[in-house]
């Protein structure tokens, strides 16, 4: 990505999410929502386990719950740069179709998949998951990892997924939601919610109850519900958003570079770096818009971290559902 492209992305985002409009009243289009989305996801953590292994375990667990089998045709909704698609393809032997509306991410996904020697098994399409361009009853299964939360209306996206699944097929999702501990009358809770919405580019973050209701509303049979973020793990999931954790993982330099290359490991950004970036932007060392990008990162990280600590936000609310047999 060039500096001019980064500036365009930053300006485009902030035309959508202005500080004075940080409220549920503004509804972004799916194109606006997806264009600024980070490429990675969060996961549960285990002591002495490398981060890369934790991420893969999180993906494989979802594949297991969806019961993905060798040779099946599976769709990945909001696939990013294809890391879960490649991981699950290797793990299961299934044929994965990754769907994403971001052309730049798809170019990288195809390149990485070719380098991994998996192009025969994993393919990618540039499509909107609110208007999936596949026929009814096409896929043997579907999954989504922290992506369908970007849909303004969960019923709309879930209904499209339901449509393209074969009868009896399963859909598993790690949905990013507000938990039942969220209290809209609590000012701190509302601030956390706003920071997640504004920082993440969400039209509105849904509650766990809304996600479950949306599944049932479109016709899915809900087989399992499990908030993995609420598990009594030795290392809470939000720990991965902290500086000490990433430093231990050896991701410091990668994380700093990621601020400008839309990768996932951006949590090392802090208030001090905000000031430094602002100064370097003034000196034209960094492109225009860099300060806004850093402010954006700090906003969502603060929201997610505090949301995790308070138990009011989970990025891994697992729902496994099935399309009824014909």
Swiss-Prot record:
A biological process term (GO) from this entry: sterol biosynthetic process
InterPro entries (UniProt xref): Erg6_SMT_methyltransf, Methyltransf_11, MeTrfase_SMT, SAM-dependent_MTases_sf, Sterol_MeTrfase_C
GO cellular component labels: endoplasmic reticulum
Record flagged with keyword Transferase: yes
EC number(s) reported in the record: 2.1.1.-
UniProt cross-references to SUPFAM superfamilies, sorted A to Z: S-adenosyl-L-methionine-dependent methyltransferases
Highest rank taxon of the organism: Eukaryota
GO terms assigned for molecular function: sterol 24-C-methyltransferase activity
Keywords associated with the record: Methyltransferase, S-adenosyl-L-methionine, Transferase
Family the UniProt entry places it in: Belongs to the class I-like SAM-binding methyltransferase superfamily. Erg6/SMT family.
This protein's name: Methyltransferase phqN
Top-level taxonomy: Eukaryota, Fungi, Dikarya, Ascomycota, Pezizomycotina
Gene: phqN
